[in-house]
Amino acid sequence: MTALTLSTAAASGLRADAIVVGVAKSPKGDKGLVVAPGAEAVDKGYDGKLAAVLETLGASGAEGEVTKLPAPSGFKAPVVVAVGLGAAPEDGQDKGTAFDAEALRRAAGAAARALAGAKKAAFALPVADAADAGTIGEGALLGAYSFDAYKENGRNAKNGKAPLAEVVLLGGKPRDKAFKAAVERAVAVTEELNRARDLINTPPNDLNPESFAAVAQAAAKEHGIKVQVLDEKALTKGGYGGILGVGAGSAAGPRLVKLSYTSSKAKKHLAFVGKGITYDSGGISLKPAGHNETMKCDMSGAAAVFAAVVAAARLGLEVNVTGWLALAENMPSGTATRPGDVLRMYSGKTVEVLNTDAEGRLVLADALWAASEEKPDAIVDVATLTGAMMLALGNRLFGVMANDDAFRTAVVEAAEEVGEDSWPMPLPEHLRKGMDSPTADIANMGERMGGGLVAGLFLREFVGEGITWAHLDIAGPAFNEAAPFGYTPKGGTGTAVRTLVRLAELTAAGDLG
């Protein structure tokens, strides 16, 4: 786990393995480079010619680009790491940093990843205020992440190096309350987000509904969160037909986990619901061969909800947050749900199963109705729900649907504020008819075109009347199969954790409805 601290030490005198500085493209449109604020002392060590040296080495200032060079004479750190911030703002040198927060976050992440194996690195990136310090710290801690639980000696096999051990932020104010709070927030959120990443990356032979529930129970106990776990017996008694139906084919029984964080000062109540399919084979409607090893990530929504609730507790937010983890393994067997079966859901509605690979909406439906019974001020569900959303938005954006346009906008804006890319999506009423069933109240499939929207319409059927609700389909960005970028690693990303935490913060502050 990477440590994060603030320091007022001079860059030249700090004992570290490296000093990280920012470099940007000239705002004038030419090919020149600009050394970003925060690196003045380092630039002085090169007699004011750091930009020229970097240009000679081929640096362009592009976002996330990393260039290493020997530190100036007299510096106690042997290496300078210059990381690209993209285009420099016109007022970047005169009026604060003016650099986009996400550019700072991604730059810090890229630098931290490039420094794997180092024990300590000083980050001299632009810090105009406490928010910048928190942003840079967040990016560095996320970028330093490495999943090495299954590697010999706990080291990443690709480079044989352990993650960067300590990040020291220069340019901040260690005794200032705002700076301290920003760093503490960054640590709490990133540690829980990285825990979500660990869960997503854990092989399905080790992570199943029961073991996931055990992880949630342990974390709840540690952070004073009330937890309730419904096993198969309790789910059967309660009539949770959706969760039971999806888990029917697996030797690992399903679970519904309820995490309740409460604040004595809370005036609002949020409910987060996460899809937790610990492995999705498709069931009887078996998935074709190819990339099935990534289907361990189908519990990313539940991991995000779990992490967000724990982060809210660690931050002591003045809002009640309930997390619902709908956990099941979708496997084919002689006891599995078949296409054509009818399930009676927790809400009392019946669902004709036309495709057992449309299982996420079934477990979510039960959890959404359970969440609705408590009449929260709003419900947000998170799920790797449809390939259709990936076709629509690609691998880096998640779709946002809601039964209230203003709330949908608020969710999209919260995501943008924390650097998560999303896009508002509609719930077209004409697509609802495609889910009509001659046998049951509704079918779990509808028209093929607009499949992500159909799934959202299905979920809406299980939200209590009068309750504000949003659905986040994170199928694209939840698991990165490409090369790492910015602070995003290969594998589980922890998408939506920061959005959920921000929604909780806004609600606590009275700025979200």
Swiss-Prot record:
HAMAP family per the UniProt record, alphabetical: Cytosol_peptidase_M17
Molecular function terms from GO: manganese ion binding; metalloaminopeptidase activity
Any Pfam family: Peptidase_M17_N
Cofactor: Mn(2+)
The keyword Nucleus is assigned to this record: no
An annotated GO BP: proteolysis
Catalyzed chemical reaction(s): Release of an N-terminal amino acid, Xaa-|-Yaa-, in which Xaa is preferably Leu, but may be other amino acids including Pro although not Arg or Lys, and Yaa may be Pro. Amino acid amides and methyl esters are also readily hydrolyzed, but rates on arylamides are exceedingly low; Release of an N-terminal amino acid, preferentially leucine, but not glutamic or aspartic acids
Enzyme class: hydrolase
Cellular component GO terms held in the UniProt record: cytoplasm
Binding site for Mn(2+) 2: K275, D280, D298, E359
The protein's Enzyme Commission number: 3.4.11.1, 3.4.11.10
Record text on cofactor binding: Binds 2 manganese ions per subunit.
Highest taxon above the source species: Bacteria
Active site: K287, R361
Residues the record lists as binding Mn(2+) 1: D280, D357, E359
Recorded family membership: Belongs to the peptidase M17 family.
Source species of the chain: Streptomyces avermitilis (strain ATCC 31267 / DSM 46492 / JCM 5070 / NBRC 14893 / NCIMB 12804 / NRRL 8165 / MA-4680)
InterPro entries per UniProt: Leucine_aapep/pepB, Macro_dom-like, Peptidase_M17_C, Peptidase_M17_leu_NH2_pept, Peptidase_M17_N
Keyword set, alphabetical order: Aminopeptidase, Cytoplasm, Hydrolase, Manganese, Metal-binding, Protease
Annotated compartments: Cytoplasm
Listed name of the protein: Probable cytosol aminopeptidase
